[in-house]
Amino acid sequence: TTDIAFASNANIQLVTSFKFASNSLFENPFSDSVKNGIIDWHKGDILDLLKKKELGELERVFNSTNNVKPSNMASFLFSLVDNSMVIKQGIDSKSIDFNRILQDDEDFKIIFVLFYTSIIYHIAQIVKEKGLTPPRHITFSGNGSRIIKVITTDWRLLARYTKIIFEKVLDKPYPSELEILGLEKGYNPKEATCKGGFVQGFTETCDNQIVVFQSHNHSFVTDKDTYVSVENEYKEQTVKSIETFFDFALNTMNSVFNFDDNFGVTSESLKIAREECKKDLLTYLEKGIALRQEESEAQDKIEETFFFYPIKGVLNALASAIYDSLTNK
Protein backbone atom coordinates (compact mmCIF):
# COMPACT_ATOMS: atom_id res chain seq x y z
CA THR A 1 0.00 0.00 0.00
CA THR A 2 0.80 3.67 -0.20
CA ASP A 3 0.01 5.26 3.15
CA ILE A 4 -0.15 9.04 3.36
CA ALA A 5 -0.22 11.13 6.52
CA PHE A 6 -0.98 14.85 6.42
CA ALA A 7 0.74 16.49 9.39
CA SER A 8 1.02 20.00 10.81
CA ASN A 9 3.12 20.99 13.82
CA ALA A 10 3.91 17.31 14.45
CA ASN A 11 0.21 16.44 14.66
CA ILE A 12 -1.48 14.09 12.22
CA GLN A 13 -4.45 15.78 10.56
CA LEU A 14 -5.53 13.19 8.01
CA VAL A 15 -4.54 9.74 6.83
CA THR A 16 -5.37 7.97 3.58
CA SER A 17 -4.22 4.65 2.17
CA PHE A 18 -4.60 2.71 -1.08
CA LYS A 19 -3.19 -0.38 -2.77
CA PHE A 20 -1.05 1.37 -5.33
CA ALA A 21 2.63 1.03 -4.54
CA SER A 22 5.88 0.11 -6.26
CA ASN A 23 4.79 -3.47 -6.97
CA SER A 24 2.04 -2.02 -9.18
CA LEU A 25 4.77 -1.10 -11.67
CA PHE A 26 6.00 -4.66 -12.07
CA GLU A 27 2.91 -6.85 -12.23
CA ASN A 28 -0.46 -7.28 -13.85
CA PRO A 29 -2.84 -6.31 -11.05
CA PHE A 30 -5.77 -8.22 -12.51
CA SER A 31 -4.26 -11.56 -13.53
CA ASP A 32 -1.49 -14.03 -12.69
CA SER A 33 0.45 -13.13 -15.84
CA VAL A 34 4.20 -13.60 -15.53
CA LYS A 35 4.83 -10.93 -18.15
CA ASN A 36 5.92 -7.39 -17.39
CA GLY A 37 7.49 -5.13 -19.98
CA ILE A 38 10.01 -3.48 -17.67
CA ILE A 39 11.24 -6.71 -16.09
CA ASP A 40 11.24 -8.66 -19.36
CA TRP A 41 13.33 -5.97 -21.06
CA HIS A 42 16.06 -5.85 -18.41
CA LYS A 43 16.27 -9.22 -16.67
CA GLY A 44 18.13 -11.00 -19.48
CA ASP A 45 21.11 -8.63 -19.29
CA ILE A 46 21.36 -9.06 -15.54
CA LEU A 47 21.15 -12.86 -15.82
CA ASP A 48 23.94 -12.80 -18.42
CA LEU A 49 26.08 -10.79 -15.99
CA LEU A 50 25.48 -13.29 -13.18
CA LYS A 51 26.52 -16.11 -15.50
CA LYS A 52 29.60 -14.23 -16.69
CA LYS A 53 30.72 -13.64 -13.11
CA GLU A 54 29.96 -17.28 -12.23
CA LEU A 55 27.54 -16.36 -9.47
CA GLY A 56 25.76 -19.69 -9.60
CA GLU A 57 23.89 -19.29 -6.33
CA LEU A 58 22.37 -15.99 -7.44
CA GLU A 59 21.63 -17.50 -10.83
CA ARG A 60 19.63 -20.25 -9.10
CA VAL A 61 17.71 -17.67 -7.09
CA PHE A 62 17.05 -15.75 -10.31
CA ASN A 63 15.57 -18.87 -11.90
CA SER A 64 13.62 -20.01 -8.83
CA THR A 65 9.87 -20.47 -9.02
CA ASN A 66 9.42 -17.68 -6.50
CA ASN A 67 10.83 -15.20 -9.01
CA VAL A 68 8.54 -16.22 -11.83
CA LYS A 69 6.20 -13.50 -10.56
CA PRO A 70 7.58 -10.25 -12.03
CA SER A 71 7.09 -8.19 -8.87
CA ASN A 72 9.17 -10.76 -6.96
CA MET A 73 11.79 -10.65 -9.69
CA ALA A 74 11.86 -6.87 -9.37
CA SER A 75 12.55 -7.15 -5.64
CA PHE A 76 15.38 -9.59 -6.35
CA LEU A 77 16.91 -7.33 -9.01
CA PHE A 78 16.77 -4.31 -6.71
CA SER A 79 18.54 -6.29 -3.97
CA LEU A 80 21.54 -7.33 -6.07
CA VAL A 81 23.51 -4.10 -5.71
CA ASP A 82 23.81 -4.68 -1.95
CA ASN A 83 24.35 -8.45 -2.17
CA SER A 84 27.57 -9.59 -0.48
CA MET A 85 28.41 -12.04 -3.30
CA VAL A 86 28.05 -9.30 -5.90
CA ILE A 87 30.20 -6.92 -3.85
CA LYS A 88 32.85 -9.61 -3.31
CA GLN A 89 33.11 -10.15 -7.07
CA GLY A 90 33.78 -6.44 -7.54
CA ILE A 91 31.02 -6.01 -10.11
CA ASP A 92 30.62 -2.43 -11.31
CA SER A 93 27.52 -1.13 -9.53
CA LYS A 94 26.37 0.65 -12.69
CA SER A 95 25.80 -2.70 -14.38
CA ILE A 96 23.99 -4.41 -11.46
CA ASP A 97 22.17 -1.56 -9.68
CA PHE A 98 18.62 -2.01 -10.97
CA ASN A 99 17.56 1.40 -9.67
CA ARG A 100 20.44 3.00 -11.58
CA ILE A 101 19.62 0.96 -14.70
CA LEU A 102 16.03 2.21 -14.60
CA GLN A 103 17.22 5.79 -14.04
CA ASP A 104 19.17 5.57 -17.29
CA ASP A 105 16.32 3.93 -19.22
CA GLU A 106 14.43 6.70 -21.03
CA ASP A 107 11.99 4.33 -22.74
CA PHE A 108 10.17 3.13 -19.62
CA LYS A 109 10.60 6.28 -17.55
CA ILE A 110 7.14 7.62 -18.49
CA ILE A 111 5.64 4.80 -16.38
CA PHE A 112 7.41 6.03 -13.26
CA VAL A 113 6.49 9.64 -14.02
CA LEU A 114 2.81 8.69 -14.29
CA PHE A 115 3.03 6.64 -11.09
CA TYR A 116 4.41 9.59 -9.13
CA THR A 117 2.18 12.16 -10.80
CA SER A 118 -0.99 10.21 -10.01
CA ILE A 119 -0.15 10.03 -6.30
CA ILE A 120 0.75 13.73 -6.00
CA TYR A 121 -2.36 14.63 -8.03
CA HIS A 122 -4.51 12.62 -5.62
CA ILE A 123 -2.85 14.28 -2.62
CA ALA A 124 -3.41 17.72 -4.14
CA GLN A 125 -7.10 16.94 -4.65
CA ILE A 126 -7.44 16.01 -0.97
CA VAL A 127 -5.60 19.18 0.08
CA LYS A 128 -7.96 21.24 -2.07
CA GLU A 129 -11.19 19.66 -0.89
CA LYS A 130 -10.17 19.70 2.78
CA GLY A 131 -8.86 23.26 2.59
CA LEU A 132 -5.44 22.24 3.90
CA THR A 133 -2.29 24.30 3.52
CA PRO A 134 -0.07 22.81 0.79
CA PRO A 135 2.91 21.02 2.33
CA ARG A 136 6.21 22.73 3.06
CA HIS A 137 7.93 19.34 3.07
CA ILE A 138 7.11 15.99 1.49
CA THR A 139 8.97 13.05 2.99
CA PHE A 140 9.16 9.55 1.55
CA SER A 141 9.76 6.46 3.66
CA GLY A 142 9.70 2.72 3.01
CA ASN A 143 11.64 0.83 0.34
CA GLY A 144 9.02 1.54 -2.28
CA SER A 145 9.94 5.20 -2.15
CA ARG A 146 13.28 4.34 -3.76
CA ILE A 147 11.30 4.10 -6.98
CA ILE A 148 11.01 7.90 -6.93
CA LYS A 149 14.73 8.12 -7.68
CA VAL A 150 14.11 6.42 -11.02
CA ILE A 151 12.47 9.66 -12.16
CA THR A 152 15.28 11.89 -10.90
CA THR A 153 17.75 12.08 -8.04
CA ASP A 154 17.52 15.88 -8.07
CA TRP A 155 15.05 16.77 -5.30
CA ARG A 156 14.94 20.40 -6.44
CA LEU A 157 13.81 19.36 -9.90
CA LEU A 158 11.21 17.01 -8.44
CA ALA A 159 10.06 19.73 -6.04
CA ARG A 160 9.49 22.14 -8.94
CA TYR A 161 7.47 19.51 -10.77
CA THR A 162 5.48 18.69 -7.64
CA LYS A 163 4.72 22.36 -6.97
CA ILE A 164 3.34 22.75 -10.48
CA ILE A 165 1.02 19.78 -9.97
CA PHE A 166 -0.32 21.40 -6.80
CA GLU A 167 -0.66 24.80 -8.45
CA LYS A 168 -2.61 23.35 -11.38
CA VAL A 169 -4.94 21.32 -9.14
CA LEU A 170 -5.43 24.11 -6.58
CA ASP A 171 -5.59 26.77 -9.31
CA LYS A 172 -3.42 29.19 -7.35
CA PRO A 173 0.27 29.87 -6.69
CA TYR A 174 2.09 27.69 -4.20
CA PRO A 175 2.26 29.58 -0.90
CA SER A 176 5.77 28.51 0.16
CA GLU A 177 8.90 26.70 -0.83
CA LEU A 178 8.67 22.92 -1.13
CA GLU A 179 11.38 20.48 -0.14
CA ILE A 180 11.36 16.82 -1.13
CA LEU A 181 13.09 14.79 1.58
CA GLY A 182 14.41 11.29 1.02
CA LEU A 183 16.27 11.61 -2.29
CA GLU A 184 19.64 12.58 -0.85
CA LYS A 185 22.55 10.19 -1.32
CA GLY A 186 22.87 7.61 1.44
CA TYR A 187 19.32 8.11 2.67
CA ASN A 188 17.71 4.84 3.77
CA PRO A 189 13.91 5.22 3.51
CA LYS A 190 13.24 1.99 5.41
CA GLU A 191 15.49 3.18 8.22
CA ALA A 192 13.54 6.44 8.35
CA THR A 193 10.33 4.47 8.79
CA CYS A 194 11.83 2.47 11.66
CA LYS A 195 13.25 5.54 13.40
CA GLY A 196 9.88 7.21 13.12
CA GLY A 197 8.36 4.26 14.93
CA PHE A 198 10.84 4.58 17.77
CA VAL A 199 10.72 8.36 18.10
CA GLN A 200 7.01 8.96 17.68
CA GLY A 201 4.75 7.82 20.50
CA PHE A 202 1.99 5.57 19.23
CA THR A 203 -1.51 7.02 19.32
CA GLU A 204 -4.58 5.42 17.90
CA THR A 205 -5.74 7.00 14.66
CA CYS A 206 -9.31 8.24 15.00
CA ASP A 207 -11.79 7.19 12.34
CA ASN A 208 -12.48 10.81 11.47
CA GLN A 209 -8.81 11.24 10.53
CA ILE A 210 -9.00 8.50 7.89
CA VAL A 211 -10.29 9.77 4.55
CA VAL A 212 -11.09 8.11 1.23
CA PHE A 213 -11.35 10.57 -1.65
CA GLN A 214 -13.85 9.99 -4.44
CA SER A 215 -12.26 11.60 -7.47
CA HIS A 216 -15.41 11.40 -9.59
CA ASN A 217 -17.40 13.87 -7.49
CA HIS A 218 -14.64 15.53 -5.43
CA SER A 219 -16.05 14.31 -2.15
CA PHE A 220 -15.14 11.83 0.54
CA VAL A 221 -16.54 8.39 1.25
CA THR A 222 -19.23 8.32 3.93
CA ASP A 223 -20.89 5.41 5.71
CA LYS A 224 -23.53 5.42 2.98
CA ASP A 225 -20.93 4.64 0.31
CA THR A 226 -20.82 0.86 0.24
CA TYR A 227 -19.69 -1.56 -2.43
CA VAL A 228 -23.28 -2.56 -3.14
CA SER A 229 -24.13 1.10 -3.77
CA VAL A 230 -21.71 1.38 -6.69
CA GLU A 231 -23.82 1.69 -9.84
CA ASN A 232 -22.98 2.26 -13.50
CA GLU A 233 -23.16 6.04 -13.21
CA TYR A 234 -20.63 5.94 -10.37
CA LYS A 235 -18.28 3.90 -12.56
CA GLU A 236 -18.77 6.10 -15.61
CA GLN A 237 -18.01 9.24 -13.63
CA THR A 238 -14.93 7.59 -12.14
CA VAL A 239 -13.68 6.73 -15.64
CA LYS A 240 -14.17 10.37 -16.67
CA SER A 241 -12.07 11.48 -13.71
CA ILE A 242 -9.31 9.09 -14.83
CA GLU A 243 -9.47 10.47 -18.36
CA THR A 244 -9.15 13.96 -16.89
CA PHE A 245 -6.08 12.87 -14.94
CA PHE A 246 -4.32 11.37 -17.96
CA ASP A 247 -5.00 14.50 -20.00
CA PHE A 248 -3.59 16.53 -17.11
CA ALA A 249 -0.48 14.36 -16.76
CA LEU A 250 0.38 13.71 -20.39
CA ASN A 251 -0.65 17.01 -21.93
CA THR A 252 -0.99 19.81 -19.37
CA MET A 253 2.02 18.86 -17.27
CA ASN A 254 4.20 17.95 -20.23
CA SER A 255 3.46 21.32 -21.84
CA VAL A 256 4.60 23.29 -18.78
CA PHE A 257 7.35 20.92 -17.60
CA ASN A 258 8.70 19.12 -20.63
CA PHE A 259 9.18 15.45 -19.75
CA ASP A 260 11.99 14.95 -22.25
CA ASP A 261 14.00 17.99 -21.17
CA ASN A 262 13.54 17.42 -17.43
CA PHE A 263 13.23 13.65 -17.00
CA GLY A 264 14.55 12.20 -20.25
CA VAL A 265 11.23 10.69 -21.37
CA THR A 266 11.33 9.68 -25.03
CA SER A 267 8.79 11.12 -27.45
CA GLU A 268 7.91 7.60 -28.63
CA SER A 269 7.05 6.39 -25.14
CA LEU A 270 4.97 9.52 -24.55
CA LYS A 271 3.08 8.81 -27.77
CA ILE A 272 2.42 5.22 -26.69
CA ALA A 273 1.25 6.42 -23.27
CA ARG A 274 -1.28 8.77 -24.86
CA GLU A 275 -2.68 5.83 -26.80
CA GLU A 276 -2.76 3.32 -23.95
CA CYS A 277 -4.36 5.69 -21.44
CA LYS A 278 -7.57 5.71 -23.47
CA LYS A 279 -8.05 1.94 -23.54
CA ASP A 280 -10.10 -0.34 -21.28
CA LEU A 281 -10.47 2.09 -18.37
CA LEU A 282 -13.92 0.80 -17.43
CA THR A 283 -12.69 -2.80 -17.64
CA TYR A 284 -9.77 -2.06 -15.32
CA LEU A 285 -12.07 -0.24 -12.92
CA GLU A 286 -14.56 -3.10 -12.76
CA LYS A 287 -11.79 -5.67 -12.27
CA GLY A 288 -10.33 -3.58 -9.46
CA ILE A 289 -13.69 -3.25 -7.74
CA ALA A 290 -14.37 -6.98 -8.14
CA LEU A 291 -11.03 -7.90 -6.56
CA ARG A 292 -11.68 -5.56 -3.66
CA GLN A 293 -15.16 -7.01 -3.17
CA GLU A 294 -13.62 -10.46 -2.78
CA GLU A 295 -12.01 -9.13 0.41
CA SER A 296 -15.13 -7.34 1.65
CA GLU A 297 -18.84 -7.75 2.23
CA ALA A 298 -21.28 -6.03 -0.11
CA GLN A 299 -22.54 -3.80 2.69
CA ASP A 300 -19.04 -2.75 3.79
CA LYS A 301 -18.06 0.87 3.52
CA ILE A 302 -15.72 1.59 0.61
CA GLU A 303 -12.23 1.47 2.14
CA GLU A 304 -10.04 2.89 -0.61
CA THR A 305 -10.34 5.20 -3.58
CA PHE A 306 -11.20 3.65 -6.95
CA PHE A 307 -8.98 6.24 -8.65
CA PHE A 308 -5.94 4.00 -8.95
CA TYR A 309 -7.63 0.84 -10.26
CA PRO A 310 -7.64 1.93 -13.93
CA ILE A 311 -4.21 3.52 -13.56
CA LYS A 312 -2.78 0.16 -12.45
CA GLY A 313 -4.16 -1.46 -15.57
CA VAL A 314 -2.89 1.29 -17.85
CA LEU A 315 0.64 1.21 -16.42
CA ASN A 316 0.88 -2.55 -16.94
CA ALA A 317 -0.46 -2.27 -20.49
CA LEU A 318 1.90 0.63 -21.17
CA ALA A 319 4.91 -1.41 -20.03
CA SER A 320 3.88 -4.19 -22.43
CA ALA A 321 3.30 -1.75 -25.30
CA ILE A 322 6.69 -0.08 -24.83
CA TYR A 323 8.37 -3.50 -24.63
CA ASP A 324 6.69 -4.54 -27.88
CA SER A 325 7.74 -1.31 -29.60
CA LEU A 326 11.37 -1.87 -28.57
CA THR A 327 11.47 -5.52 -29.62
CA ASN A 328 9.94 -4.66 -33.00
CA LYS A 329 12.53 -2.02 -33.85
Cite the ranges covered by each PLM segment.
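Secondary-structure transition/capping motifs at alpha-helix termini
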Residues: N11, E129-G131, Y161-I164, E204
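Acidic, glycine/GT-rich loop-and beta-edge segments that sit at the periphery of enzyme/chaperone cores
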Residues: P175-K329
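Conserved helicase motor "Helicase C" RecA-like lobe of SF1/SF2 P-loop NTPases
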Residues: I147-S176
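Phosphate-binding glycine-rich/basic clefts of nucleotide- and phosphate-handling proteins
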Residues: D3-T153, S215, S219-T244, D261-L282
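Proline-rich intrinsically disordered, low-complexity coils
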Residues: P29, P70, P135, P173-P175, ...
